[in-house]
A protein has these predicted regions:
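Cysteine-centered iron-sulfur cluster-binding motifs in ferredoxin-type domains/subunits
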Residues: 208-246, 255-279, 294
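Structural motif corresponding to the early beta-alpha repeats
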Residues: 1-15, 36
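Intrinsic disorder at enzyme termini
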Residues: 285-286
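Beta/alpha (TIM)-barrel catalytic core signal, keyed to glycine-rich beta->alpha loops juxtaposed to Asp/Glu
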Residues: 35-216, 220-229, 233, 244, ...
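CE4/NodB-like, metal-dependent polysaccharide N-deacetylase domain
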Residues: 13-34, 56-61
């Protein structure tokens, strides 16, 4: 489970939340417990409320087996946290072949930082919110030419799972077909070859140039929007039009406008950008969406 650091108000929240989680899960301890979504700002919150001290104490009392944190920031901030808190057993990172060379996500640099500190790695977003399933047609063709017996998603998850020091690869599955697909290639896992790894990184660089707005649809931005703008949905429509996956999304855009705030309603308060794990320039991107569809 995880301690929602960004939403803590007082130091006492940690103990209250933790014991509620134990009760709801019906367990006496957690195998893995992490501080949720640390970045340079949330790290200060964790320090302010003694979150590191608390989870270390819970580990000492046998209520947690391994402690760590999920992370969304640059490698230098990760290095700072791991240097100041060597007691951490693992770190959860966003790693996929699309973000491997990304200047904002810094998958490669963050992974190398965790390895330097000798930490186990838990990987989130291996298919980047579905972006590495719904790839451009030319990329899909290249993957099928490489091995037509494997799904598009399998390449992304195998890329993550092939890295050393990786303990777990988290995969969000929405149906049994996806579950069975994951089992098919992970049951007797075959790591990528060096050639395959290099090929996927090159594909990632290619895909990154084709994605207009690299949103993962995590929805962190939407709950606090004062204008009820469904930001990820608008970005998805914009990307599909730009990638020519569908040339006309006007009807869907109109439906969204009727049920939610529209991009032009944005008052530029910036709350969405403060919580975005991808560090997207959401305000300016909403203007792009409006220009495209209005």
């Amino acid at each position: 489970d995880k301690l929602p650091v960004p939403f803590m108000k007082v130091k006492e929240d940690a103990q209250k939340i933790f014991y509620e989680q134990l009760e709801k899960c019906g367990v006496e301890y957690f195998d893995y417990y992490l501080l949720h979504s640390l970045n340079r700002n949330h790290y200060q919150t964790a320090l302010k409320f003694d979150c590191f001290v608390f989870i270390k104490k819970m580990k000492e009392e046998g209520k947690i087996k391994e402690i760590g944190f999920s992370f969304h920031d640059t490698a230098d901030i990760l290095d700072q946290i791991l240097t100041e808190h060597p007691e951490m057993d693992f770190v959860q990172l966003q790693i996929n072949y699309l973000d491997w060379n990304s200047d904002s996500v810094q998958s490669k640099l963050c992974y190398e930082t965790a390895v330097k500190h000798g930490k186990k790695v838990v990987i989130m977003e291996p298919v980047k919110g579905g972006s590495l399933v719904h790839v451009p047609e030319d990329v899909k063709t290249k993957l099928f030419n490489l091995d037509n017996s494997l799904s598009v998603a399998s390449w992304a998850i195998r890329f993550a799972a092939s890295l050393k020091n990786v303990r777990v690869v988290l995969s969000g599955m929405s149906n049994l077909e996806q579950l069975y697909d994951n089992i098919s290639y992970m049951k007797e896992f075959k790591p990528l070859t060096q050639e395959e790894n290099k090929f996927l990184i090159q594909l990632g660089d290619q895909i990154r140039t084709s994605i207009a707005i690299p949103c993962t649809a995590c929805n962190y931005c939407t709950p606090g929007c004062p204008k009820n703008i469904c930001i990820p949905e608008y970005f998805s429509l914009y990307n599909k039009r730009k990638q020519t996956l569908s040339k006309d999304k006007s009807d869907e855009y109109d439906n969204l406008k009727n049920e939610h705030g529209k991009p032009l309603d944005c008052i530029e308060c910036g709350q969405c950008e403060r919580v975005c794990p991808q560090k997207l320039l959401i305000i300016s991107n909403l203007k792009k969406v409006a220009e495209e569809f209005e």
